[in-house]
């Protein structure tokens, strides 16, 4: 099979719950006293406040089921809060039409559905918010689609039907769609799903490239803590429908919030040798950004 490569170069205060909403006014997404319920009478989120800063790469991390994807869906307008306010670029999402929202943010959401279309047709969907009456792609739109496919590493699959691709290749095609949309804010819900290790790092390098070179704001829901720590400027930590901390990555790590959420201890990389000597049998140490993470003893 033809190999495609994602184009990219591999390449700050922490707040606790009481003041988690008191962030810089320069934010891309803001949640103000948000409550949400999946079932009547049972609140999944209650009084949640958080902010995603503009101009940064932010990872939303936490255990399975803590509310990370719910947070993204509230911003994307796929869910509506039971109470409170969600803003994107200063606009209340409750008052935004879908086309208006699509001009503000591009969203890669989790989905098991495989649309019956080619890669090029899927990526072209990212241009729909920019099309005028008649909905036909112009020369600039076609150029944007080609550029997005090249950057996401799927140009060689442009004429392939999506069902012919592997899960990882389809995921990269959806990433290309978000790139073609060309918004200042990109929101990615588990973008590394189905990707192998090398492709994960290539994708994260592309994310950093979009931020550093083009000034894009990127917010990611991500389970892989190693990738979150390596590539994020800012972390939002969640547990059981609550934001427990947010801020620059190193400061959130120093606060202990990440370790508490994942039941792991985190120490500086230069303590690796001594920690290995003390590690319990079966524990596996992982290094990243100058830190060592290992499971806490039960």
What is the predicted function of each stretch?
Residues 76:
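Helix-to-loop junction immediately C-terminal to a conserved catalytic motif
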Residues 14-31, 35-47:
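A short, flexible loop at the N-terminus of ABC-type nucleotide-binding domains that lies
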Residues 84-92, 101:
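Conserved ABC transporter NBD signature motif
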Residues 186-190:
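Catalytic Walker B motif of ABC-type/P-loop ATPase nucleotide-binding domains
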Residues 135-136, 161-165, 169:
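Conserved ABC ATPase signature
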Residues 61-63:
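The feature captures the beta-strand-to-loop junction immediately N-terminal to the Walker
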């Amino acid at each position: 099979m033809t190999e495609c490569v994602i184009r990219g170069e591999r390449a700050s205060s922490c707040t606790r719950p009481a003041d988690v909403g008191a962030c810089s006014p320069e934010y891309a997404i803001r949640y103000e006293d948000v409550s949400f319920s999946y079932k009547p009478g049972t609140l999944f989120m209650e009084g949640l406040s958080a902010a995603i800063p503009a101009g940064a790469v932010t990872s939303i991390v936490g255990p399975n089921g803590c509310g990370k994807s719910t947070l993204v869906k509230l911003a994307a307008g796929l869910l509506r809060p039971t109470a409170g306010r969600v803003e994107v670029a200063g606009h209340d999402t409750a008052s935004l039409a879908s086309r208006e929202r699509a001009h503000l943010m591009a969203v890669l959401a989790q989905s098991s559905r495989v649309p019956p279309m080619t890669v090029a047709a899927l990526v072209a969907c990212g241009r729909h918010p920019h099309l005028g009456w008649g909905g036909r792609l112009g020369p600039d739109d076609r150029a944007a689609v080609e550029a997005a496919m090249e950057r996401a590493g799927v140009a060689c699959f442009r004429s392939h039907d999506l069902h012919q691709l592997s899960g990882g290749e389809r995921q990269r095609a959806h990433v290309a769609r978000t790139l073609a949309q060309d918004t200042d804010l990109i929101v990615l819900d588990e973008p590394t799903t189905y990707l192998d290790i090398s492709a994960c790092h290539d994708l994260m390098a592309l994310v950093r490239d979009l931020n550093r070179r083009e000034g894009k704001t990127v917010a990611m829901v991500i389970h892989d803590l190693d990738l979150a720590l390596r590539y994020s400027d800012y972390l939002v930590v969640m547990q059981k429908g609550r934001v427990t901390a947010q801020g620059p990555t190193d400061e959130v790590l120093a606060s202990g919030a990440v370790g508490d959420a994942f039941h792991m201890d985190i120490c500086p990389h230069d303590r690796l040798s001594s920690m290995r000597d003390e590690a319990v049998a079966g524990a596996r140490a992982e290094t990243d950004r100058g830190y060592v993470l290992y499971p806490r003893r039960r």
